[in-house]
């Protein structure tokens, strides 16, 4: 009985401590966050009003129009 109670307690704590994951954006290359890390840049905004943080290598390159 004590083992069952201990197991349930541990499972409850683990479910509360582990994050459910962050929402993905920009073709699954970015993550919706309140703040971006130093190696990431904001390119668009997510549906939940958070910033879509994307590493620069996954952002599209700007092309100049040719006339």
Curated annotation (Swiss-Prot):
Record's GO cellular component terms: extracellular region
Cellular compartments annotated: Secreted
Signal peptide (from-to): 1-20
GO terms of biological process kind: defense response to Gram-negative bacterium; innate immune response
Main location, first listed in the record: secreted
Keywords for the protein's UniProt record, in alphabetical order: Antibiotic, Antimicrobial, Defensin, Disulfide bond, Secreted, Signal
Disulphides: 25-52, 32-46, 36-53
Family listed: Belongs to the beta-defensin family.
Record's function text: Has antibacterial activity.
Protein name per UniProt: Beta-defensin 123
């Amino acid at each position: 009985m004590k083992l069952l109670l201990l197991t349930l307690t541990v499972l409850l704590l683990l479910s509360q401590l582990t994050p459910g994951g962050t929402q993905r954006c920009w073709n699954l290359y970015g993550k919706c966050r309140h703040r971006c890390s130093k190696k990431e840049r904001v390119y668009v905004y997510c549906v939940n009003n958070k910033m879509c943080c994307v590493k620069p290598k996954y952002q599209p390159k700007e092309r100049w129009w040719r006339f």
